[in-house]
Design a protein with these regions (language model features):
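Surface-exposed, charged secondary-structure patches
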Residues: 150-197, 299-340
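Core segments of small alpha/beta cavity-forming domains
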Residues: 92-150, 227-300
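Extracytoplasmic/luminal low-complexity segments enriched in Pro/Gly and acidic/polar residues
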Residues: 277-400
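Cytoplasmic C-terminal tails of single-pass
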Residues: 22-71
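Bacterial signal peptide processing site
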Residues: 79-82
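C-terminal motif of bacterial Sec signal peptides marking the signal peptidase cleavage site
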Residues: 74-77
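Membrane interfacial helix motifs at helix-loop boundaries and amphipathic/re-entrant anchors
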Residues: 1, 89-94
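Short beta-strand edge/turn micro-motifs at domain boundaries
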Residues: 1-26, 84-85, 190-257, 317-325, ...
């Protein structure tokens, strides 16, 4: 369309130019004077047609002005249209939306709490698997087993559905074509003031499946929870192999475990904020005490810490850091140092799982830890912080 306007403008200019030529009239050559053969300079009085030329040029200006304005207007119209289209294309950003509404969130959490409570009451693993998976499932399965062996074993803490103090749903594109698992993090507060808040991490693996609980983590006192987006906006998930956070996420259990073994002397201690980490303080003290006690009875103990379930789940905070839920498996290997001696277990759960008081060959004890870390963005002055932790025993076996 702009090209047609340009052609029309050129045609109008052409006819305008022809009109000017007609108004100017014919060009005349001034004759020489008959008085002599010499050529003399022409003066203004010898140019009788100049007055008409000036008049003609005045008309030319009158003709050209509207034609030029029309041309500029037509071309300007073409240019404006093109500019608007370009701007519209440049500012077209992908529309984001959250995976669930507030009503859906309340229904999901309420149903989860009800179903898990029913499974806990009946100690029904099959029913539990309908709504719980991963590390949270493994810890509860062992608890059901222990409850079946002894009435002295207490059930695990109930899931608190309300009130929800933090809800962080995953963002997705409104134009999403390939379905991806949905993730949801939320914090609930118990009506019992003696019980701290708990963080739940849920995922929906496919459109036909329910949201399942992967992590149920007790938040530690004295740690400020990072600022996160409001529920209506949500946030993006953090890939386990991302390169913009301060550490590789799969290495968190190993590095933190090294700190549990070596304390402030660990080479990784400077990357973690340990000043308000009550979990670290209790575990480091407990491991040191066990090592000293076993040394007195001529036995050794070795503590190993590694990544448990490979499903590391992370979500971005407002400062571009990450809330990272990760599984850490602790393995304690105890061996007697003298022939004919044996090592014994003292905890109730360990005795029930071993079906014995000890072993002459040694013991292998495994625990599952569900941990929540705040990992700052790479290059930040902030340190990695442990925000929450929950632990449960998995197994006790005699060494062969």
């Amino acid at each position: 369309l702009g090209f047609l306007f340009l052609i029309a403008a050129l045609i109008m200019n052409y006819f305008g130019f022809r009109n000017v030529r007609k108004l100017r009239g014919p060009r005349r050559r001034i004759p020489r004077a008959p008085s002599g053969p010499k050529y003399r300079k022409r003066v203004k009085s010898d140019l009788p047609r100049r007055g008409r030329r000036v008049s003609g040029r005045g008309n030319a200006k009158y003709v050209f002005a509207p034609i030029s304005l029309i041309t500029i207007g037509l071309l300007g119209g073409c240019t404006t249209t093109q500019s608007v289209n370009t701007t519209e294309q440049a500012t077209k950003y992908p529309q984001l939306q959250v995976v669930i509404t507030d009503n859906q969130l309340q229904r999901i959490v309420g149903d989860l709490a009800t179903k898990v409570k029913a499974a806990d009451t009946a100690r029904d693993v099959i029913e539990l698997q309908q709504r719980v998976t991963g590390p949270a499932l493994e810890i509860r399965k062992v608890n059901y087993l222990l409850q079946g062996k002894s009435k002295k074993i207490k059930p695990l803490r109930d899931i608190v559905a309300n009130p929800i103090t933090v809800a962080l749903p995953m963002q997705i594109s409104a134009d999403e074509t390939d379905w991806q698992p949905r993730t949801l993090m939320l914090v609930t507060k118990s009506p019992n003031s003696k019980i701290g808040p708990q963080l739940m991490v849920l995922q929906q693996a496919s459109p036909r499946e329910n949201y399942k609980l992967w992590y149920l983590i007790d938040l530690l006192p004295g740690n400020a929870f990072p600022k996160v987006a409001v529920q209506d906006i949500g946030t993006l998930t953090v890939a386990a192999d991302n390169a913009f956070l301060a550490t590789k996420l799969s290495s968190l259990p190993y590095k933190y475990g090294n700190i549990l073994n070596n304390g402030a002397e660990s080479k990784y201690a400077r990357y973690f904020n340990l000043s308000s980490d009550g979990f670290y303080e209790a575990r480091f003290a407990d491991q040191s005490k066990q090592a000293k006690t076993l040394k007195k009875v001529k036995a050794t103990i070795k503590f190993l810490h590694k990544l448990g379930d490979p499903n590391i789940i992370g979500m971005l905070t407002l400062k571009s850091g990450g809330l990272i839920a990760v599984s850490m498996t602790d393995t304690s290997i105890i061996k007697p140092t003298t022939r004919g001696s044996a090592v014994s277990v003292t905890e109730k759960e360990q005795k029930l799982l071993l079906n014995s008081r000890g072993s002459s060959t040694g013991l292998k004890i495994k625990y599952e830890n569900m941990l929540l870390f705040y990992v700052p963005v790479s290059g930040s002055n902030e340190k990695i912080r442990l925000l929450g932790a929950s632990q449960g025993i998995l197994s006790v076996k005699a060494l062969k």
